[in-house]
Curated annotation (Swiss-Prot):
Record gene name: rpsN
The protein's role, per its UniProt record: Binds 16S rRNA, required for the assembly of 30S particles and may also be responsible for determining the conformation of the 16S rRNA at the A site.
Classification via InterPro entries: Ribosomal_uS14, Ribosomal_uS14_bac/plastid, Ribosomal_uS14_CS, Ribosomal_uS14_sf
Gene Ontology terms: biological process: translation
Name by which UniProt lists this protein: Small ribosomal subunit protein uS14
Similarity section: Belongs to the universal ribosomal protein uS14 family.
Keyword Ribonucleoprotein (UniProt): yes
Length: 89
């Protein structure tokens, strides 16, 4: 389980990205890089980390499911992820 402060920081970044998305796009299209650099650093989409929605783990996250590899395997074996089953050939 990731620290609550790390998860909260990432959520705060997501909110900032959403808030400044239109303004960033407008400034990029205008080529005004001076004004773009004045915006908060955390309003850039590259600062947001994909995290597991259950554990907050930041590595080994399947973006399609929003789960880390550990939780994905656990839930898939329990049959709790629709359409996912163990491979057999």
């Amino acid at each position: 389980m990731a620290k609550k402060s790390v998860i909260a920081r990432n959520e705060k970044r997501k909110a900032l990205v959403e808030k400044y998305a239109a303004k960033r796009e407008e400034l990029k299209n205008a080529g005004d890089y001076e004004a773009l650099s004045k915006l908060p650093r955390n309003s850039s989409a590259t600062r947001v980390r994909n995290r597991c929605v259950l554990t907050g783990r930041g590595r080994g996250v399947y973006e399609k499911f929003g789960l880390c590899r550990h939780m994905f395997r656990k839930l898939a074996l329990e049959g709790k992820i629709p359409g996912v089953k163990k491979a057999s050939w």
